[in-house]
Amino acid sequence: MVKIRLKRIGKKQAPFYRIVAADSRVNRNGQYIELIGTFDPLKSEVKINNELALKWLQNGAQPTETVRELLSQQGVMKALHEAKLANKK
């Protein structure tokens, strides 16, 4: 199963994360399939490629709780919901 999750790359006491699509069996900081965005919790700065995130979500990738909140803040989850409603019509 593919998950959209955070990969930590910052230094000690200075966390910085990449938002990645990765196989759920790979460890947190292991290989990933594709880079979707970044998250800096110290500056509360989130950069997400909305098109890539939507592509992975539509293909069945499961976001972790934290990533789901970040995607919601950026409007990606709303766009996914609207796309699903449009497909039903």
UniProtKB/Swiss-Prot annotation:
Gene3D superfamilies per UniProt: 3.30.1320.10
UniProt keyword Ribonucleoprotein, yes or no: yes
GO molecular function per UniProt: structural constituent of ribosome
Keywords noted in UniProt: Ribonucleoprotein, Ribosomal protein
One cellular-component annotation, GO: cytoplasm
Pfam family, one: Ribosomal_S16
PROSITE patterns in alphabetical order: RIBOSOMAL_S16 (PS00732)
Family, per entry: Belongs to the bacterial ribosomal protein bS16 family.
HAMAP family: Ribosomal_bS16
Protein name: Small ribosomal subunit protein bS16
Organism: Mesoplasma florum (strain ATCC 33453 / NBRC 100688 / NCTC 11704 / L1) (Acholeplasma florum)
Lineage of source species: Bacteria, Bacillati, Mycoplasmatota, Mollicutes, Entomoplasmatales
